[in-house]
């Protein structure tokens, strides 16, 4: 991070940087009651051989934090949050550059623990995998490439405004479940935890291997994005392009990511819609595309929002946004490819989903190339 420090900062940077670091330590120890965030566990002491790197990184962060705190006219509360975000970003960057971040084996333990908890008797079709996949998707799909806001970096669905966005109805189930995992591994950020949960859900349900890496940090309620950034299921192809192009996805990636509907079902008390997309809603496959293309569909006669049902069994459903994929010529060609070739779908989905869950995370926060997490079997 670079900026032109005002004269006040130049003359007092040492003293106020120290004050800011002290402020940081106080912030870490308290619970963010006004933000609704969790208590942050004090990190373990760094290895002595890298202490100089850490202090150097935190010194840069302290100067940046001091600038925001003293030089922008913000309220103390806003400045404290902004300063703490700057420090967290700096710490993540230092960890990435000095090799201090926990290794793959530590994150594999988190993955394994999530995998152990996926089966849940009495919940939907007996698995939490679909709702964990949805959590990872929705936590990442708020990104805007125009201003760099949104995405998985700050895990802002922890806060009431975003949690209550209509598109996130029902995701409290996933967040509450993942909170139990967080208690076992308090060092992992929520953004890393939720996206790793999505990767686990896909892989453990027979889907492709998804490249994943840690580096996301937790943010504040002020970083919540506006409502309306996630797809509206009642809309058509123009809406899909508007939503996905904002994140930087093309037509092929839009169709590939829509394949996540291979898993799960809709609920009248959440989205208003009802039913699964496929006959195997806890298995990740290309069945969604085959059914979408090959089955005859009709409007469902009911009192709920407009949706489609299959003519044969009337047990499956498709949303207006799903049907848009076969009505649009550009989208349809990818539906055909994926319906006929599951291997191609898996390959394209893995690339698109890995891209999705990294949206909004500064490149400097990554420690290296993505990992391949081993499945439980």
Swiss-Prot record:
Can you tell me which residues form the catalytic site?
138, 277
Binding-site residues, heme b? 261
Q: What does this protein do?
A: Destroys radicals which are normally produced within the cells and which are toxic to biological systems.
Spell out the SUPFAM superfamilies in the cross-references.
Heme-dependent peroxidases (SSF48113)
Query: Any idea which UniProt keywords this protein has?
Result: Heme, Iron, Metal-binding, Mitochondrion, Oxidoreductase, Peroxidase, Transit peptide
Q: Which Gene3D superfamilies match?
A: 1.10.520.10, Peroxidase, domain 2
Any single GO BP term? hydrogen peroxide catabolic process
- The transit peptide segment here is 1-32
SUBUNIT field: Forms a one-to-one complex with cytochrome c. Interacts with MID1 (via C-terminus); the interaction may contribute to cellular detoxification of radicals.
Give the UniProt family note: Belongs to the peroxidase family. Cytochrome c peroxidase subfamily.
Named from the GO MF annotations, one term is: heme binding
Reactions accelerated catalytically: 2 Fe(II)-[cytochrome c] + H2O2 + 2 H(+) = 2 Fe(III)-[cytochrome c] + 2 H2O
Look up keyword Iron and say if it applies.
Answer: yes
EC no.? 1.11.1.5
Question: Per its record, how is this protein called by name?
Answer: Cytochrome c peroxidase, mitochondrial
UniProt-annotated site: Transition state stabilizer, residues: 134
Keyword hit for Hydrolase:
no
> Major place of localization?
mitochondrion
PROSITE patterns referenced in this protein's UniProt entry, alphabetically: PEROXIDASE_1 (PS00435), PEROXIDASE_2 (PS00436), PEROXIDASE_4 (PS50873)
Gene Ontology CC, one term: mitochondrial matrix
Q: Which organism is it from?
A: Cryptococcus neoformans var. grubii serotype A (strain H99 / ATCC 208821 / CBS 10515 / FGSC 9487)
Entry's localization field: Mitochondrion matrix; Mitochondrion intermembrane space
Q: How is the cofactor bound?
A: Binds 1 heme b (iron(II)-protoporphyrin IX) group per subunit.
Cofactor entry: heme b
